């Protein structure tokens, strides 16, 4: 059976090579060719013996998911639509800044968590992405951005904040994270990789044990009553449990703070009283807040909080000593802003709000 080498992290690739009677250093060579150099053709791996190249051609492929479209925003943001098969596509976003280049990666085709303010959840859920489909987004973005030639690192940061809940696809997300960290692959620092979660408490503990990277928690409400409505997973893992999990994660995290993501919804969660409730909620967790202006999508009942309200809300948090930033909306002209990623999902598990765009239309 032919295997896709993009599905292997360093450890599993070494094990597969051993099964083929090859030494560990050969696996490292191939890993460097695939991920550092972005090479998919075994014949182009010139420092590998011809006999091994022939063996690889017979037993393996390097098959990243295809890029269906590549849209460039007026602000330099790029959104890639990635074909993951069976009529499904996911979205990957590159956000350039003066001091960094951040790639936002998807981990699922759709999302089952159905957060009230997020268009991905309204598309429904199909399936988890494979390791190749997750790391393949980074592989393809490096090619599109010209980052596979020369020493300059175009993508300096990766965030698992695209479509889906990374911790609901734990095994494949962690394998992809390990490739990002591997010096023979992408060589990123743990501090420069962020996993975003809506609060799957037991799996947060697993991440801390197995692959601690920077953590962002989609908080969005200061109390259980409101969060139950906005982030339904809260009904299973309420805020008291979530805050305790954040404290445990900090014992293993590469950064000494948790980032709390907080979407600003006009008249819903943006009052002074909400800000004061937040201060009481997070008093035992060393944290930063990232306030996110709501990005509208068809069928949503919410409105973006006025800019002055967002500034005042941030001031309350900062006056209490909490570092608080307001995310600059990027890529909204190409629907690449936070909460707008919808891709194309053939939903088999629950109803879908709005129309799902077939890939044949997306390509046109």
Curated annotation (Swiss-Prot):
Keyword Transferase: yes
Protein residues bound to [4Fe-4S] cluster: 111, 115, 118
Phylogenetic classification of the source organism: Bacteria, Pseudomonadati, Pseudomonadota, Betaproteobacteria, Rhodocyclales
ATP-binding keyword on record: no
Protein name in the entry: Dual-specificity RNA methyltransferase RlmN
Alphabetized InterPro entries for the sequence: Aldolase_TIM (IPR013785), Elp3/MiaA/NifB-like_rSAM (IPR006638), Methyltransferase_A (IPR040072), RlmN_N (IPR048641), RNA_MTrfase_RlmN (IPR027492), rRNA_lsu_MTrfase_RlmN/Cfr (IPR004383), rSAM (IPR007197)
Catalytic function, reaction form: adenosine(2503) in 23S rRNA + 2 reduced [2Fe-2S]-[ferredoxin] + 2 S-adenosyl-L-methionine = 2-methyladenosine(2503) in 23S rRNA + 5'-deoxyadenosine + L-methionine + 2 oxidized [2Fe-2S]-[ferredoxin] + S-adenosyl-L-homocysteine; adenosine(37) in tRNA + 2 reduced [2Fe-2S]-[ferredoxin] + 2 S-adenosyl-L-methionine = 2-methyladenosine(37) in tRNA + 5'-deoxyadenosine + L-methionine + 2 oxidized [2Fe-2S]-[ferredoxin] + S-adenosyl-L-homocysteine
Localization terms from the record: Cytoplasm
Main location: cytoplasm
Domain Radical SAM core: 97-333
Cofactor binding annotation: Binds 1 [4Fe-4S] cluster. The cluster is coordinated with 3 cysteines and an exchangeable S-adenosyl-L-methionine.
Active-site residues, Swiss-Prot/TrEMBL: 91, 338
The enzyme's E.C. designation: 2.1.1.192
GO molecular function: 4 iron, 4 sulfur cluster binding; metal ion binding; rRNA (adenine(2503)-C2-)-methyltransferase activity; rRNA binding; tRNA (adenine(37)-C2)-methyltransferase activity; tRNA binding
């Amino acid at each position: 059976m032919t295997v896709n080498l993009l599905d292997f992290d360093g450890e599993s690739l070494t094990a597969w090579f051993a099964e083929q009677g090859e030494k560990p250093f050969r696996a490292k060579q191939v890993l460097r060719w695939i991920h550092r150099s972005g090479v998919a053709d075994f014949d182009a791996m010139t420092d590998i013996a011809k006999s091994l190249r022939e063996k690889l051609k017979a037993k393996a492929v390097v098959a990243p998911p295809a890029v269906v479209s590549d849209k460039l925003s007026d602000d330099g943001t790029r959104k890639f639509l990635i074909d993951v098969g069976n009529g499904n596509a996911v979205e990957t976003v590159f956000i350039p800044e003066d001091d960094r280049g951040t790639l936002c990666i998807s981990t699922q085709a759709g999302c089952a968590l159905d957060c009230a303010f997020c268009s991905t959840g309204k598309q429904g859920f199909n399936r988890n992405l494979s390791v190749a489909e997750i790391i393949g987004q980074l592989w393809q973005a490096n090619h599109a951005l010209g980052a596979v030639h020369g020493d300059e690192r175009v993508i300096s940061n990766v965030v698992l904040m695209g479509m889906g809940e990374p911790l609901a696809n734990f095994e494949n997300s962690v394998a992809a994270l390990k490739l990002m960290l591997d010096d023979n692959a992408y060589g990123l620092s743990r501090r420069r990789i962020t996993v975003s979660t809506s609060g799957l408490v037991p799996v947060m503990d697993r991440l801390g044990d197995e692959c601690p990277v920077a953590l962002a928690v989609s908080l969005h409400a200061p109390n259980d009553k409101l969060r139950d409505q906005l982030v339904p997973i809260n009904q299973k893992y309420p805020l008291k449990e979530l805050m305790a999990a954040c404290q445990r994660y900090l014992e293993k995290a590469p950064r000494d703070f948790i980032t709390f993501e907080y979407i600003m919804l006009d008249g819903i969660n943006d009052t002074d009283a909400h800000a004061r409730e937040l201060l009481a909620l997070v008093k035992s967790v060393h944290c930063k807040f990232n306030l996110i202006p709501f990005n509208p999508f068809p069928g949503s009942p919410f409105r973006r909080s006025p800019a002055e309200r967002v500034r005042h809300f941030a001031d309350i948090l900062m006056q209490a000593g909490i570092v608080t930033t307001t995310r600059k909306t990027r890529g909204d002209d190409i629907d690449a802003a936070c909460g707008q990623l919808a891709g194309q999902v053939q939903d088999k598990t629950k109803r879908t709000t709005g129309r799902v765009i077939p890939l044949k239309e997306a390509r046109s």
